[in-house]
């Protein structure tokens, strides 16, 4: 399925039905009085997060979504039927904002999360509401209100635990194929990956994480060069970034250190928070370096790159070092989840709140 991560739509809620100005007409009842019912409420437009959907492609082609109008009221005190709501199912991770003002409206981060995008108009009043001691046969009624109408921008940020970044042909697609169930296109030319790929990595019966591969970055990506700039947003929600570097390029004129520095610079230009995110260095294609020279080449790279974080040496093609990398990632993600759960438990437990209050200065 083609991956679409951005769309623009218009949502139109239904108009409320008009009230009825009807009089009761019945044999042997001379002054029946008013019996006009109210109009029905217009249908609303709702958005629902669905984990079974992973693209916004449906909204690229169906751009206008209109709910039903409410039916008008009728005589005999009959109220009009309310218009049916419509439900727009969107991928988890969709950000909804106002297209004209840019104001954020919602961030659908949980499966089943539901939000009203456009409220249906209220129905008009029938003439039974205008009866009084001085007006026994009112002819007044009100029309239904217009439903809300909005132009919206939908933007999808994939929810993954691990994000891959690197230059084109660094081996990202090969790695995600080797360690997960994803099957992206792999070829020996730049920008083989044209859209993000998600894969599930399983390191045990009940232990797994989601990994995302985005198109390769090049220098100037933050300003729009290449393809990767369109997908950098997907890295903002990952728990850890794997910076993949081709340590043994075929072209001798390519400097792996310069490529690695360029990637970091592009992250900084796009979003400073991406640079601060936990990032691991993964040196790929180490099998292309003679074993007796491997240690020296890796040490020289780390020294020139001035890297002080975790380092993994792998070959995505042969699988060398991939298991070690996956288990380390799973252990790290598990520890982060435990810390987060403990923090949430403490925040919800009144005993910890009382302790914090006791320690606070008077």
From Swiss-Prot:
> What are the entry keywords?
Cytoplasm, GTP-binding, Hydrolase, Magnesium, Metal-binding, Nucleotide-binding
Q: Which cofactor does it need?
A: Mg(2+)
**Protein name as catalogued:** GTPase Obg
| Record CDD domains | Obg (cd01898)
* Annotated family: Belongs to the TRAFAC class OBG-HflX-like GTPase superfamily. OBG GTPase family.
Q: Which Pfam families match?
A: GTP1_OBG, MMR_HSR1
Cellular compartment(s): Cytoplasm
Its GO biological process terms? ribosome biogenesis
Q: Which residues form the OBG-type G domain?
A: 160-334
UniProt xrefs under PROSITE patterns: G_OBG, GTP1_OBG, OBG
